[in-house]
């Protein structure tokens, strides 16, 4: 590409600038670049830019900045997105005579700190900072580090949303209030934007020059405490691909000697980036900011309550404040307090504010003053038509002033509003669960027994364990309940798990089911928690941990657990005892709101001889538990809340199960307006045909398909008009489907 100036030499220098809002590229050779740099007003260069306005010189300031970092006196500071690279009018600021703790007068040119930083102390002085509550220990620790002679650079580390930035705002507020040591009196906390600092430094050496100028400015102003949020960004910021001169390396000497006081904030994971640079890390003093407790969060919310009430023009009840803290901690697992509780408070206020039909009183007052001024101006100019218009506007605004919302009319946000927002965020029916919780726990055993037949002992044990946990007597952080269901196939182990999910969590979809026959190999543990670093699939989430992370209120069913590899069972030792598991990405997943149920057929083989309608079952539990020791280790079995044996089903149990299955058939037939009536003899016949001591109740479902559903299908296809059907026994002992009316006629004739 040829030079745009001489059109002879190849262009080796490419400059970018914004002209009238459009980006323009200038391609120059070395000779033309030197000429233009020396004389930006060169006529050839002005012709190349296609600008006719002689007074407008878009590139003069650019090259002036390259030469001495000082624009012409009549040129405003260039923003960082333009070709000046963000240096603007900062050159003269550091050399002005001023007091060490005073803000420069408005007539002075802005320095880099004012251009790329925000004065947090000034914001605190205006009262625009939310109250900082419950962080006194962290603020005192930061002040102690800042009071040191060298290496006085605290770095706040903690999970996202725990209040790291709030600690710095609290420090700024203490400086404004004068509640700091003498060394920190009059200091100014400046929050530096590293991204803007790097922006516009396209030419090699510009960023280093800007950093040196920033350092010089900070050295001259001894009242500066520099705050860098996301401080890990300084590692690698501004470095070229083949160089090692980044912001972190430039700051190292000043940080070690105490010439620069720096406060940083970053997360635990991102602080590892700084830890990789040992020389930089030793100059930092980490301050851990822990997640507040629920009680501390409630105190924080009450402290900022007034700010949000004034902003949204609503009122928060004490119940809503407590619900925001407790329910967010209980149902929102992938974020941290107090951030998630504050978000609930803010969103609830926003939701209620949208229902208000009024304008902010401050806006009305401002518009009224503007209308009165415009009316006066129109009257002076004898524009009476315009004056009449503004007179009507003034009357309108005064009428709106009378409709100001009063304290009595201010909408109140209750616990229900918070619950509704959580339902939208998590798809958990929080309101329904809370309303039903009391009565649900009382009648839990009865509700389960109505769906799970013949396992009253198992149901009673489960209900007691869950009630004990919900009342608050359970061990903290452990799952709501952990059970091992043992018994022969087809006796209701999986069915009880499904009904338990419906009763406790409102839907069978809340059950997370795993067939443990898929986890028979040693490496299959990675499928549950995610592959470790260096293995294929590392970026993919684990099947178990990811589902529980997004749906913490779930029932986890591990079917046929004895078939899984022993390492899988070892992994669940921590889950059953501590209620937590770390996935392949290093995230800790909580199981404290889940119910864990494992089913097994282990130990039932030697007791099958006792299965039957009239068999005695004394001593059977002991034999099953004794056999479990051959399949599971003692430390594994010791961690369950209960090992529950499911007994073989009796004939009466099977009759009740048949009735439930037939009720399900009727429910499916109702979509076609068909109703089926089944006699007691038919039910007994179905039990005789479908019972197998080794198979439990599962063969009954196939029997009903063969003798009821298939027969109904054939009869309905031949008689589509018949909607009222009845299953009866024939004289030969077969099951037959007939019209209910015809069956009644025949039975009445036999009676006669």
From Swiss-Prot:
Location of the UVR domain: 365-400
Organism classification: Bacteria, Bacillati, Bacillota, Bacilli, Lactobacillales
Organism in which the protein naturally occurs: Streptococcus pneumoniae serotype 4 (strain ATCC BAA-334 / TIGR4)
II: region residues: 413-604
Source superkingdom: Bacteria
Physiological role: Could be necessary for degrading proteins generated by certain types of stress.
Membrane topology, as annotated: Peripheral membrane protein
Annotated region (I), positions in chain: 113-360
Up-regulation conditions: By heat shock.
Signal peptide (from-to): none
Disordered: region residues: 67-110
Keyword terms of this UniProt record: ATP-binding, Cell membrane, Chaperone, Membrane, Metal-binding, Nucleotide-binding, Repeat, Stress response, Zinc, Zinc-finger
Comp. bias regions, Gly residues: 83-94
Record localization: Cell membrane
InterPro entries for the chain: AAA+_ATPase, ATPase_AAA_core, Clp_ATPase_C, ClpA/B, ClpA/B_CS1, ClpA/B_CS2, ClpA/ClpB_AAA_lid, ClpA_ClpB
Residues the entry annotates as binding ATP: 158-165, 487-494
Protein's name according to its UniProt entry: ATP-dependent Clp protease ATP-binding subunit ClpE
GO BP annotations listed: cellular response to heat
One GO CC term, this protein: plasma membrane
Keyword Acetylation annotated: no
GO MF terms held by the record: ATP binding; ATP hydrolysis activity; zinc ion binding
ZnF start-end (C4-type): 3-32
UniProt xrefs under Gene3D superfamilies: 1.10.8.60, P-loop containing nucleotide triphosphate hydrolases, UVR domain
């Amino acid at each position: 590409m040829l030079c745009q100036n001489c059109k002879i030499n190849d262009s080796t220098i490419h400059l970018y600038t914004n002209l009238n809002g459009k980006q323009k590229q200038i391609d120059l050779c070395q000779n033309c670049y030197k000429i233009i740099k020396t004389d930006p007003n060169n006529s050839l260069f002005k012709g190349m830019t296609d600008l006719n306005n002689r007074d407008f010189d878009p590139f003069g300031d650019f090259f002036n900045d390259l030469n001495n970092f000082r624009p012409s006196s009549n040129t405003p500071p260039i923003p960082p997105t333009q070709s000046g690279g963000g240096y603007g009018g900062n050159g003269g600021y550091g050399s002005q005579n001023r007091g060490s703790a005073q803000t420069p007068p408005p007539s002075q040119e802005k320095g880099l700190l004012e251009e790329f930083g925000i004065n947090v102390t000034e914001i605190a002085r205006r009262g625009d900072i939310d109250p900082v509550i419950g962080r006194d220990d962290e603020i005192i620790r930061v002040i102690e580090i800042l009071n040191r002679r060298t290496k006085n650079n605290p770095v706040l580390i903690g999970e996202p949303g725990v209040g790291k930035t709030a600690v710095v705002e609290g420090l700024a507020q203490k400086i404004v209030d004068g509640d700091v040591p003498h060394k920190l009196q009059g200091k100014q906390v400046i929050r530096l934007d590293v991204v803007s600092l790097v922006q516009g430094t396209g030419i090699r050496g510009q960023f280093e020059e800007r950093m040196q100028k920033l350092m010089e400015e900070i050295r001259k102003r001894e009242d500066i405490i520099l705050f860098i949020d996301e401080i890990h960004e300084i590692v690698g910021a501004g470095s070229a691909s083949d160089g090692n001169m980044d912001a972190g390396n430039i700051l190292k000497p000043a940080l070690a000697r105490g010439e620069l006081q720096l406060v940083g904030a970053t997360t635990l994971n991102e602080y590892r980036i700084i830890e990789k640079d040992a020389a930089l890390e030793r100059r930092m003093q980490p301050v851990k900011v822990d997640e507040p407790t629920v009680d501390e969060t409630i105190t924080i919310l009450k402290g900022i309550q007034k700010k949000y009430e004034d902003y949204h023009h609503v009122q928060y009840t004490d119940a809503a404040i407590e619900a925001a803290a407790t329910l967010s901690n209980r149902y929102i697992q992938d974020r941290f307090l107090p951030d998630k509780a504050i978000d609930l408070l803010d969103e609830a206020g926003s939701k209620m504010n949208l229902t208000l039909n009024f304008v902010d009183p401050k806006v009305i007052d401002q518009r009224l003053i503007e209308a009165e001024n415009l009316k006066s101006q129109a009257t002076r100019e004898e524009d009476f038509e315009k004056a009449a218009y503004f007179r009507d506007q003034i009357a309108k605004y005064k009428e709106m002033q009378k409709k100001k919302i009063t304290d009595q009319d201010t909408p109140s946000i209750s616990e229900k509003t918070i619950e509704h927002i959580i339902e939208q965020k998590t798809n958990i029916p929080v309101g329904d669960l809370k309303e039903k919780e009391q009565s649900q726990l009382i009648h839990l055993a009865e509700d389960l027994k109505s769906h799970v037949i013949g396992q009253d002992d198992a149901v009673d044990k489960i209900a007691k364990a869950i009630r004990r946990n919900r009342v608050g007597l359970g061990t903290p952080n452990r799952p709501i309940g952990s059970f091992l269901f043992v018994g022969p196939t087809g006796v209701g182990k999986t069915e009880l798990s499904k009904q338990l999910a419906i009763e406790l969590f409102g839907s069978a979809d809340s059950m997370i089911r795993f067939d443990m026959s898929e986890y028979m190999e040693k490496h299959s543990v990675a499928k549950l928690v995610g592959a470790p670093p260096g293995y294929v699939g590392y970026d993919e989430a684990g099947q178990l941990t990811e589902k529980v992370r997004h749906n913490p209120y779930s029932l986890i069913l591990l079917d046929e657990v004895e078939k899984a590899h022993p390492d899988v069972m070892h992994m669940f030792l921590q889950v059953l005892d501590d209620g937590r598991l770390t996935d392949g990405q290093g995230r800790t997943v909580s199981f404290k709101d889940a119910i864990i149920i494992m089913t097994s057929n282990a130990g039932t083989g030697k007791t099958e001889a006792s299965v039957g309608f009239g068999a005695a079952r004394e001593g059977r539990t002991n034999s099953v538990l004794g056999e479990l020791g051959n399949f599971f280790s003692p430390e594994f079995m010791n961690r369950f809340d209960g090992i529950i044996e499911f007994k073989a089903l009796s004939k009466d149990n099977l009759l009740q199960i048949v009735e439930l299955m037939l009720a399900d058939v009727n429910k499916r037939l109702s979509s076609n307006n068909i109703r089926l009536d089944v006699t007691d003899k038919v039910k007994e016949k179905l039990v005789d045909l479908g019972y197998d001591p080794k198979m439990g109740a599962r063969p009954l479902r196939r029997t009903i398909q063969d003798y009821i559903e298939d027969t109904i299908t054939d009869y309905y296809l031949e008689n589509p008009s018949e909607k009222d059907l009845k299953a009866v026994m024939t004289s030969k002992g077969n099951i037959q489907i007939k019209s209910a009316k015809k069956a009644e006629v025949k039975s009445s004739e036999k009676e006669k």
